[in-house]
Amino acid sequence: MPILPKYESFWAFLLIACLIPVLAISVSNLVAPSTSKNPEKSTTYESGIEPMGESWIQFQIRYYMFALVFVIFDVETVFLYPWAMSFDDLGIIAFAEVLVFVIILIIGLIYAWRKGALEWS
C-alpha cells in the first residue's frame, strides 16, 4: 500500500518535469557539434563589420522601469479578465475587492508617474 496514494500523480508529474530538461540538455550536448577555440568565432557579430568598442554596454534604468510598469499593468489585465467574465455570478463583494485592487494599482501608477518612471527623454 502506497504511503500517500493521493499524491501518486503529483510525484509522477514532478519526476517527468525534472527529467525532461535533463534529457533535453543531455541530448543537446551529445548531438551538438564541438565548439572550436577559434577567436574569430567568439567575436561579436555586427553585420560583417569589425566590432568597435566593448560588447557590454550599460543600459539606463528607465528602460527597466518602463518595462516593469508595463508588466504590472499587463498582469492586472490578466487578473481582471476572469473577474469581468463572471461578474454576474460574483456579486457586490467581488466588485468591492476588485475596486480595492484597481485603486492600489492606480496609487502605484501615480507613484511611478511622480517618480518619473514614465518619462521618456
Curated annotation (Swiss-Prot):
The keyword Transcription does not apply. One of its GO terms (cellular component) is chloroplast thylakoid membrane. It is an enzyme of class 7 (translocase). One of its GO terms (molecular function) is quinone binding. It is found in: Plastid, Chloroplast thylakoid membrane. Its EC number is 7.1.1.-. Keywords: Chloroplast, Membrane, NAD, NADP, Plastid, Plastoquinone, Quinone, Thylakoid, Translocase, Transmembrane, Transmembrane helix, Transport. Its main location: plastid. It is a multi-pass membrane protein. The chain crosses the membrane at residues 10-30, 65-85, 90-110. It catalyses: a plastoquinone + NADH + (n+1) H(+)(in) = a plastoquinol + NAD(+) + n H(+)(out); a plastoquinone + NADPH + (n+1) H(+)(in) = a plastoquinol + NADP(+) + n H(+)(out). The keyword Translocase applies. It holds the Pfam family Oxidored_q4. It comes from the Eukaryota. Disulfide bonds: none annotated. GO terms for biological process: photosynthesis, light reaction. NDH is composed of at least 16 different subunits, 5 of which are encoded in the nucleus. Belongs to the complex I subunit 3 family. PANTHER family: NADH-UBIQUINONE OXIDOREDUCTASE CHAIN 3. NDH shuttles electrons from NAD(P)H:plastoquinone, via FMN and iron-sulfur (Fe-S) centers, to quinones in the photosynthetic chain and possibly in a chloroplast respiratory chain. The immediate electron acceptor for the enzyme in this species is believed to be plastoquinone. Couples the redox reaction to proton translocation, and thus conserves the redox energy in a proton gradient. This is NAD(P)H-quinone oxidoreductase subunit 3, chloroplastic. The lineage of its organism: Eukaryota, Viridiplantae, Streptophyta, Zygnematophyceae, Zygnematophycidae.
